[in-house]
């Protein structure tokens, strides 16, 4: 890595701009950095939570997101009620927020109504922003934002994480045949559980990790497209919000053990 990358690229790329209070508030609400959550440290414009959101979020978007709460799904009528905004205008704003990666959406409720969710940074908005070529080209700092938010929340805490991760970070689902003979493997740890649950709705999407690293010269020779598989409502999300997703079909290549191939 070049010296200027080490010293400059993980800082606010636009220090000359005035500090935006709604973005600071939103960054503080979404972050999972313990020191900031506990009030031991103050979030500033030099922190990635601020400059990452500032790149993809207007003040108006931030005000709406602040009313959503983190990982608290809300339908459009519910958001109209708590924001007082016109329904059509609000829906257009939410669509823009989803396009930028600030929020996601799904239909996982008894009435199967579309609901909007303000996610964490990782996994969440920092990844989504890196999946969209248009966003990443306009705001290459999003690559560094993803790296920072996948690393700094756990600094000083990783030694306390027990084997298995305790639900922290991302969970790897191994190849099915590697766990079929394991008596301790529960259904959630088998890829067949997830593929059967969301049968018929899959999408291939780019690897946000690979795409983000290329923005600060740590990329590899891999083509980042098509590495990740989104299932269920997330498949619709990565396609509809132009996260370079495309619907695919998954075929059983053998009846037992179950191996899967994407096409």
Residue ranges and their predicted role:
Residues 252-263:
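Single conserved hydrophobic/aromatic residue that forms the stacking wall/gate
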Residues 2-46:
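Long, low-complexity, charged/polar intrinsically disordered regions in eukaryotic proteins
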Residues 140, 146-238:
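Long, Pro/Ser/Thr-rich low-complexity/intrinsically disordered regulatory tracts in eukaryotic proteins
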Residues 98-108:
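A short, conserved structural fragment
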Residues 71-82:
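Short acidic, hydrophobic short linear motifs in intrinsically disordered regions
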Residues 55-62:
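Short helix-coil-helix linker/hinge
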Residues 115, 120-149:
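Short, amphipathic alpha-helical interaction segments positioned at domain boundaries
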Residues 85-96:
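Short amphipathic alpha-helical interaction segments
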């Amino acid at each position: 890595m070049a010296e200027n990358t080490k010293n400059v690229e993980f800082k606010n790329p636009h220090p000359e701009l005035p500090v935006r209070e709604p973005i600071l508030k939103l960054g503080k609400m979404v972050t999972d950095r313990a020191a900031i959550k506990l009030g031991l440290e103050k979030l500033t414009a030099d922190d990635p939570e601020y400059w990452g959101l500032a790149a993809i979020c207007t003040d108006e978007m931030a005000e709406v997101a602040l009313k959503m709460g983190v990982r608290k799904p809300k339908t459009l009528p519910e958001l109209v009620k708590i924001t007082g905004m016109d329904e059509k205008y609000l829906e257009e704003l939410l669509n823009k927020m989803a396009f930028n990666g600030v929020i996601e959406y799904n239909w996982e409720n008894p009435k199967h109504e579309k609901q909007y969710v303000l996610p964490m940074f990782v996994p969440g908005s920092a990844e989504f922003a890196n999946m969209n070529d248009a966003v990443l080209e306009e705001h290459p700092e999003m690559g560094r934002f993803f790296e920072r938010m996948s690393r700094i929340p756990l600094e000083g805490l990783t030694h306390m994480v027990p084997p298995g991760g305790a639900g922290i970070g991302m969970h790897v689902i191994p190849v099915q045949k590697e766990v079929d003979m394991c008596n301790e493997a529960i259904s959630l740890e088998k890829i067949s559980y997830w593929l059967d649950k969301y049968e018929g709705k899959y999408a291939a999407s780019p690897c946000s990790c690979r795409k983000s690293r290329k923005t600060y010269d740590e990329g590899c020779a891999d083509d980042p497209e098509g590495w990740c598989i989104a299932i269920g409502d997330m498949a619709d999300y990565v396609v509809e919000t132009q996260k370079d997703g495309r619907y695919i079909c998954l075929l059983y290549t053998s009846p037992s053990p179950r191996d899967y191939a994407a096409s």
